[in-house]
Every structure is written in C-alpha cells, then in structure tokens.
Amino acid sequence: MKIGFFDSGIGGMTVLYEAIKVLPYEDYIFYADTLNVPYGEKSKGKVKEYIFNAAEFLASQNIKALVIACNTATSIAIEDLRRNFDFPIIGIEPAVKPAINKCTEERKRVLVVATNLTLKEEKFHNLVKEIDHHDLVDCLALPGLVEFAENFDFSEDKIIKYLKNELSSFDLKQYGTIVLGCTHFPFFKNSFEKLFGIKVDMISGSVGTAKQLKKVLADRNQLGKGSGSITFFNSGHKIVDQEVISKYKRLFEILDETQRSHVGH
C-alpha cells in the first residue's frame, strides 16, 4: 500500500522530500491540486471542497496513510478529514512553538510567513495566543511566493525584489527566526537568508511531519518494503509526460541545493 501526499500545488514536494529521507522504502502518490491552486487566497468553503475531493480520490487508490502537505489545508480541514476516513492523516502546521522558545532565550522576534488563509484561521491565532506570552510574533502573508513556485520560477533576482518590497516596513535585524508557514516557502530559503543574514534560523514543519508519519506507520506495524517510487497526479489526472515528471523531480534538486548552502554555514 502506498502513502498519499496532498497539496494545493507543488509545495508539498518539500514535505515529501523529508519523508523520503526517513522512509526510503515506501511508495508514494503525490496529488497536486494544480487546477485550483492557490488555496491561500480562496474562500474557506471552496478550499474545503477541493480538499475533500482530493482525499476521496486518494482513498480510492487504497492508501495506508495520508499526509496533508499544505498548511492551509491542515488548518481548515484536518479534523473533518479524520472524522471521515479510517486511515491515519498527518498534517503540517507553522512551527511556531520551537521558534518562540528559541527567540525568548535570545530576545529576538519571530516572523511567521504563510498564506492569507492560514494566518486568518482561528486555529493559528489560538496557537500563537497560547504560547506567545511576550508578544514576539509578527505575521506576513506572501502569496507571491506560491505563484513563483507554481510557475517553476526560482529566479533569485525576481524573488528578492518581491521579498524586499513585501518586507519594506519590517526591521529585519530584530528577527531571530523565520517560520516558513507554507510548504512552498522552503524552496526560497536562500533568498530569505540573503535578506535576513545567515544567522537567522528558518524553521518549517516538514521535518516534524515526516518524523510523525514514520512514527504513525511504525506504531501500526505498517512500515513498507517498497522502492521509493512516486506516482504523480494533477487534480486527479495521472501525470505520464516524462518532461513534467522531470520538472517535479528537479524540485528535489533545488531543495538539495538549499540544504547544501545551509550546511556550508
């Protein structure tokens, strides 16, 4: 049985990238809802409908677990999904808690970057309210980064220009940690680093989600003996065009490059 991964677009590849590291012998289905991306700028009701359509499709593929590799979809629908399906469902949320713990010690601020919909969600506000006792957290929606990623446009000059414009009213020196609260954003780690400096920490929930997936499968005695294959679907349509598949797999190379540059520091 395979593991299903779902995202509004290609952002979930950043989570799949981490999952393959800890679970190399599983087989995966990656479902990108490219017909309806971006989710972060749409109504909650519409997005929930898209999410359930994707989950129904993945359930029909006889998966053993589902990873909602999208912060927006997790915040909107994970509880409802768990009530409706009998396989384990693992989500991803902005990694605010470790960021606050670290920045409290260092007397620095935390910047959470995400989509509009994630930042508006009550679930996110409750999470921040519960743990941000020193008013350290600032938030910024960066929908343009989702568009860059979905267009496979990783031109650093364009991205830095966009980020500089969006961050023009922020004092960048006051931040100790950037929380990448959208799964599309780890593709742009190097651009964030060029603006904030190499000392700033960048945290996403991807690693924790991958570890949680492994734990859930181990607890259920469902760890696989597969080959690490990935089958790609765009909004329910299987991708057979090798050129498109190569574009998807090239995303792993981009993530390799961002990780190498961070190891270098």
Curated annotation (Swiss-Prot):
Catalysed conversion reaction: L-glutamate = D-glutamate
Gene Ontology terms: biological process: cell wall organization; peptidoglycan biosynthetic process; regulation of cell shape
Gene3D superfamilies in UniProt: 3.40.50.1860
Coiled-coil segments: none
Function description: Provides the (R)-glutamate required for cell wall biosynthesis.
Gene Ontology terms, MF aspect: amino-acid racemase activity; glutamate racemase activity
PANTHER family: GLUTAMATE RACEMASE
Keywords linked to the UniProt accession: Cell shape, Cell wall biogenesis/degradation, Isomerase, Peptidoglycan synthesis
Annotated residues for binding of substrate: D7, S8, Y39, G40, N71, T72, T183, H184
Top-level taxon in the UniProt lineage: Bacteria
Protein name, per record: Glutamate racemase 2
Pfam families in the cross-refs: Asp_Glu_race (PF01177)
Database matches in InterPro entries: Asp/Glu/hydantoin_racemase, Asp/Glu_race, Asp/Glu_racemase_AS_1, Glu_race
Keyword Protein transport among record annotations: no
Assigned protein family: Belongs to the aspartate/glutamate racemases family.
Enzyme Commission number(s) from the entry: 5.1.1.3
HAMAP family xrefs: Glu_racemase
